Regions:
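M16 family metallopeptidases and their MPP-like homologs
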Residues: 1-14, 59-79, 89-196, 210-211
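Substrate/cofactor-recognition hotspot
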Residues: 82
Length: 211
């Protein structure tokens, strides 16, 4: 990882290193001349692409521009994704549509909200289900029990144990993005505080975004 004018090396091992191995890592020279900053310009584009292949099933996906990580706003979108996945898309895309899998996810790091299906015998109808799911949520067509189930699902995913190496990498990544332990706890607490109105607001936000 390049940070400011210094290069950082993150080294994670599942085995105990010998002193010789540790000394070897410490002896590596990562210094370099000049500035490490690179100016790159990006422009957002939204493409609608279909790639026909000789198969009876499809992979379909739809993505939306969503807010970058914020302890206050992000919980609304992560709960919306869980609600759509478990209460709407599972029934429409998998049970009724016949897809092997599908769902919705929100990535706060990239600011992207995604819906997808795979091994899906349908195509256009599935895309319509994606759009209709946001209409369903924006109309508040869900109850408090569904919201509670979504909160428990999200918190279970946050709290699930990982390997020591996985925990080390996760902690490094979050700290490098200025997400302190206090910041993360605030995010977790805010998941409890999300209301039905918050989820409706998040759905309305995505409905008005290009895809």
């Amino acid at each position: 990882k390049t940070k400011s004018d210094k290069n950082e090396l993150l080294f994670i091992s599942n085995i105990k290193l010998t002193n010789e191995q540790i000394d070897g890592i410490r002896s590596l020279d990562f210094e370099k001349d000049g500035s490490s900053s690179i100016n790159v310009e990006f422009s957002k584009t939204f493409n609608k692409v279909a790639l026909p292949i000789n198969t009876q099933v499809n992979f379909s996906a739809m993505s939306f521009d969503a807010p970058i990580y914020d302890p206050k706003d992000s919980p609304k979108f992560v709960l919306l994704s869980s609600l759509l996945r478990n209460e709407y898309l599972h029934k429409r895309v998998r049970e009724q549509g016949g897809a092997y899998g599908g769902g919705a996810t929100y990535d706060p790091f990239s600011g992207t909200f995604k819906m997808f299906s795979y091994r899906d015998p349908r195509f256009i109808e599935t895309l319509e289900d994606f759009n209709n799911s946001l209409t369903w949520a924006s109309l508040g067509s869900f109850d408090d029990d569904m919201i509670l189930e979504s909160k428990l699902s999200v918190l279970s995913d946050i709290d699930k144990p990982s390997s020591p190496a996985g925990e080390a990498f996760k902690d490094y990544r979050l700290n490098s993005e200025n997400r302190s332990q206090k910041n993360r706890q605030t995010y977790r607490n805010n998941i409890f505080n999300v209301t039905k109105e918050d989820i409706v607001e998040a759905a309305e936000y995505l409905k008005n975004k290009p895809r």
